[in-house]
């Protein structure tokens, strides 16, 4: 785990406890699970940095974390006490997380909302309630969109845009090329768990522009991995081969995977 490295970028004292034996089993049995952990490390660190920057300098007063899963950022990040943080996920997931965290105290105001985000009525009512109590909201959908259809993502984007205080939205985004690679490696395993990979729009972030959300910042996973010294094995070979590709192809590789900050237009 990243937290246990001497040069760790982040320290999550709750990660191993939350992951439990099931988490170890997934990493052990999933093809290339350990060797591909670099991408999750990079994503986590970049999300951390974006959150701290948005909260610290851009006046965000509430973070809405959709499909929050086992994310323990309210407990491990040095967030201001005045910040409101709302986790949304299915009941079993949130209850397991809170029971596992036990007496640990979050650094900010924290609320766990049990909700099925696939229910449009429930989703819209939740967004309206959150929007009414905040001035500037940062939305997080870390690790979520890739499991949704284009129509699902479009509906979510539309519902988020309907709330004036929802100003920024942080996503992770895959390209069609990466989706094919991931499907070849892990597609059967993910499909057997009822979580097939789906969303990787050919138009990239333009998909969201058409829905009222513009790209504010794009953090290439490959570039961030180099910055953080967490590159995948054989990346040097990818870089060498890339020198011989035209600029258009190099840009396609750069945007194969990224963390994106969107803002309402």
Task: Indicate where each model-derived feature is located.
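Conserved beta-strand signature within the Rossmann-like core of class I S-adenosyl-L-methionine
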Residues: 138-140, 157-176
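Short, glycine-/aromatic-enriched active-site segment of Class I SAM-dependent methyltransferases
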Residues: 179-195
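Rossmann-like AdoMet
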Residues: 1-113, 120, 124-129, 133
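Core SAM-dependent methyltransferase catalytic element
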Residues: 230-265
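Short alpha-helix
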Residues: 195-220
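A short, conserved alpha-helix within the catalytic core of class I
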Residues: 112, 120-124, 147-165
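Conserved catalytic loop of SAM-dependent methyltransferase domains
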Residues: 214-240
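A short SAM/SAH-binding and catalytic strip from SAM-dependent methyltransferases
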Residues: 136-151
